[in-house]
């Protein structure tokens, strides 16, 4: 019985860890990608991603892209550049 509970607990932790983070572009309030267009944008993007709990961040296609973001952060993962609310 204890072995079954331990196995179940490990499975839940692994599933939570896999579902708890993802990669994507940061969005502003209008669901537009946060732009990287100024000198120093790459380091600002990396800093912003780190503050949000991501493992890394960099400018990609002129937008701020974070890796291993938490689910609570709103991101957009495909090629759409801006969506109106």
From Swiss-Prot:
Its main location: secreted. InterPro entries: LCN-type_CS_alpha_beta_dom, Scorpion_toxin-like_sf, Scorpion_toxinL/defensin. Expressed by the venom gland. It is found in: Secreted. Keywords: Disulfide bond, Ion channel impairing toxin, Neurotoxin, Secreted, Signal, Toxin, Voltage-gated sodium channel impairing toxin. Transmembrane segments: none annotated. It comes from the Eukaryota. GO terms for molecular function: sodium channel inhibitor activity; toxin activity. Residues 22-83 form the LCN-type CS-alpha/beta domain. Residues 1-20 form the signal peptide. Disulfide bonds join 32-82, 36-59, 45-64, 49-66. One of its GO terms (cellular component) is extracellular region. It holds the Pfam family Toxin_3. Gene3D superfamilies: Knottin, scorpion toxin-like. Belongs to the long (4 C-C) scorpion toxin superfamily. Sodium channel inhibitor family. Has the structural arrangement of an alpha-helix connected to antiparallel beta-sheets by disulfide bonds (CS-alpha/beta). This is Putative sodium channel toxin Ts37. It comes from Tityus serrulatus.
């Amino acid at each position: 019985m204890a072995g079954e509970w331990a196995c179940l607990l490990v499975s839940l932790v692994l599933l939570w860890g896999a579902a708890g983070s993802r990669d994507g572009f940061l969005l502003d309030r209008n669901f537009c990608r946060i732009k990287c267009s100024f000198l120093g944008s790459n380091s600002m993007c990396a800093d912003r991603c780190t503050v949000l709990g991501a493992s890394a961040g960099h400018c990609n296609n002129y937008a701020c892209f974070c890796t291993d973001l938490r689910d609570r952060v709103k991101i957009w993962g495909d090629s759409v550049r801006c969506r109106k609310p």
